[in-house]
Amino acid sequence: MINPIDGRLADLDERLFMPRELSWLSFNARVLQEAANESVPVIQRLRYLGIFSSNLDEFFRVRVAEIRRLITLSTGGKRQRAKELLETIQEQVAHLQQEFDRTQSKVMAELKRRHIYIIDETELSRRQLTYVEDYFAKHVLPALEPILLSDELAIPALADESLYLAVDMKTPEGDKYAVMEVPSDVVGRFVSIPRGRDAQGKVFILLDDVIRACLPRVFRGVFSIESASAYCFKFSRDAELEIETSINESLIEKMASSLKQRRKADAVRFVYDATMPEMLLEQLRKRLGFGRSDSLIPGGRDHNSQECIGLP
């Protein structure tokens, strides 16, 4: 006979329970394990990488944002426990990001073995480069809106979960920095390009690498550029909606107002190319309002892997 448990749930030692945030990270680690499983079809593995990335974005926008609010609003032991939980989350996410990068490299190698090539701008043949430059001029350049970083001008509100390029330019007047959104919602993240003359299969290049290949054209007539490099980054904002209680607005009007305010909500995570120069990273960190102890996560060259789900 099973004895009933005496006492209330509130009386149990909280150390017996795993915080729901860490439990959720364990679940997403399981998704990443599926992406690493070589018995799973390679296209499905790629989609698991996309699911992992999308899940992590939502985790920061909702769960981590909630913990940050708790740290801000609470005091004493409750605040300290929230700070310790946030530190644990940051450590686990950094580990997961490293594992993600390793798994992604293996999946890309397997795609190549099956004659599906995703190349970058450094691997383009002369014929492919000509195609990419023409594609850029017709479809990509009109959709780009570069923003110069200047101490005199405030940076406009950037869209969370969008992919951006941070640009480091060497000019005769000194270093110049800019950011621009990668317009994958307009053009698509994967661009199909011609194969090599003797190659088989399909060849794609990421839209961000199309922009990298043609970077000097973006600023032609603005700067005399000696060299330029671009580094991916993205960030997540607090997803909480604050609904005003005014009786003079309809629910739809209240929701619309709340969604507009969310565009200016606190940023809760910043993921960036680990090779980004320190000066450029510091500029972005300050302008996006991140402290040094916040969730700044170095990663690989490419981000927004949830778009892998839509690989043609």
Roles of regions detected by a PLM:
Residues 2-312:
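N-terminal non-catalytic structural scaffold regions of very large proteins
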